[in-house]
């Protein structure tokens, strides 16, 4: 950066891969655009399509006879979701109990819930703590508990949607194909660029790479069958191109994350950024927020000193392209840069008082990034290259037209 941030390009200068929506104009024109909470109505699908959604639900929730299922919930979760998990557990000869917290925003598990979790073999959770609390990680690692995070399954009617009905095996093959885009071994630099001037770099060691590749999510295991697993339902949010815990980093460990992210949008804002906003990292922390508009002021107010919690990459071709609420986009090649700040944002507390994420968090979003891992391209102008993998295309043939399944994004 040489002490100065790169100058962002204007919207008119953005480069777009023909036929794929990734520009600000595309976001603004989209009927599915959502950056703030609002109730969605999901039209009923036909019975054949609905059964595909039900089948995926039952397979991801891989409850075994004799399991003890604990569900961590919140007051805003559709009660039918709880009933669905309970019914599946009872139908498979498992026991079930649920615990309702005040919200989803716990970053650590409260003591009264720890006693319930200690007995569990299978956990379904809406809580943010599920992924970051060392207590939860230890339960998976030491007791082999299987966890399902349901950030994106808060309404039972989602079973009627194309994203819920997308073949879970095909999704796993897409993830494995993305995993094959990483180098096989050795240290490398993961680099993110885009037409606005983003130049963001994450150094990877071979140890980090091998740890990431062993994770069940990067092996395309999106059903909660393996002891110690952690999966998302609806599958899949991510998996993350970078996540400190997933690559074996210890808290406060620094690896030299540097550079500038000129995001197009962020969770908590109704529309994409009206003027350029750049978040600059130096030595693994947010050093500055560049820009003159309202959005830049909001981010500058609380992100300075924050750290990178994740870089998530969407993998679900039938996820609504421009729905980024509550935790970033799930559409292929769309990225969210998750940053945890040192203090909560008053702005986010005002506009999203019941947000599913803690108010210290921020997901910056890009749809047109180019990502390289060493000298290997992974994403080009927002297009996830694993969608063209021969194994992915061959598997897609089993389920229908590969072009429709893999590249007809709902916008």
PLM segments and residue spans:
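Short, Lys/Arg-enriched N-terminal segments with co-localized hydrophobic residues
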Residues: 1-16
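Dual-mode signal for accessory low-complexity, basic/Gly-rich regions
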Residues: 272, 288-351, 401-409
